[in-house]
Amino acid sequence: MDIRQVTETIAMIEEQNFDIRTITMGISLLDCIDPNINRAAEKIYQKITTKAANLVAVGDEIAAELGIPIVNKRVSVTPISLIGAATDATDYVVLAKALDKAAKEIGVDFIGGFSALVQKGYQKGDEILINSIPRALAETDKVCSSVNIGSTKSGINMTAVADMGRIIKETANLSDMGVAKLVVFANAVEDNPFMAGAFHGVGEADVIINVGVSGPGVVKRALEKVRGQSFDVVAETVKKTAFKITRIGQLVGQMASERLGVEFGIVDLSLAPTPAVGDSVARVLEEMGLETVGTHGTTAALALLNDQVKKGGVMACNQVGGLSGAFIPVSEDEGMIAAVQNGSLNLEKLEAMTAICSVGLDMIAIPEDTPAETIAAMIADEAAIGVINMKTTAVRIIPKGREGDMIEFGGLLGTAPVMKVNGASSVDFISRGGQIPAPIHSFKN
């Protein structure tokens, strides 16, 4: 490696906010199933605290050795609805508390997997878990929850969509931070290292390490050097920069898996912003020539960014996975916040952007008097985009305050301006229930 590459890497870390966003250990809990929920909770606690005992120490050790910040150490587990279904319990809050206790014991930032997969209907544990979510998130600190309500192969479970509109409202009423730890998915992936949507899929190995990187500031700085040049040059610049960022993620993942003695899973090729100035996906899009994010051309700029990040990242890694694309959470990106505040970015434009990027309507504050059916309809719209386009989409929405208020979450979750929501009713649409069938192009066999 020549000296130019060394100084380039140092600048990425010191000046451009490059970091490894997360090392996430996925742990299967299938061997913790027990008909007695308290025994199951104890088995869960024991397995997590045994398998992930050294996760934080190893993460800190690698960060110090390489001089690269590793912001979060996290754990994801088998969807808890599968574990709880073996019991006769009428709620799974005790399992959420076991996860929380284990997370605190090992020192991780979050633990994901208080989850249910209901894209084609409810099994015994699913409805119990979904109804447990508001209390589970109110009575724990580190637990994250997700529900998959649709897939390209199965269509959209509209009964579950309606239920999740209600659950989001109940969660917001019970706690300030609960809704920030709850995601509703279509086409959820089994190897996602990012919260709040991470869970450990049943097809994964017993224990694995997945890595998520962050580097929008690095991409922006690279694009500053090619101002005014053609999109061919822009695309090549993003691709080469993504390769460098992702290569470091690959190295960190390999080191962590070797030292922890577990399999290395994937690097997630996502560009994840933070509220810090200089760490914004929105500012990358503006660097391409937009006056502000939300104006015409935003979706095209995002398409270029998303695709070139994948092209550069794929060559840098043995295995890629997770969500892999650009994240556009409003509260976690100072450029997105500014665009909402100046009126150039609204919910409808955000929805268009989600047809391109990873995830969907993420960390968006809406008025607290928004009906549950309207929230459910937002989920249905996002699910439709994901199901038809064969990609992951999601909703993490915060019904708090009144339009124009600023909702403060703190830390990586940032600050969200409360956005205007279309006031026309979707009640009759959502109350139908049932299943929206899978699209014709999903029928491949």
Swiss-Prot record:
Transmembrane segments: none annotated. Signal peptide: none annotated. Gene3D superfamilies: 3.20.70.20. Pfam families: DUF711 (PF05167). NCBIfam families: PRK05313.1 (NF003700). Homodimer. Belongs to the UPF0210 family. This is UPF0210 protein spr0218. It comes from Streptococcus pneumoniae (strain ATCC BAA-255 / R6).
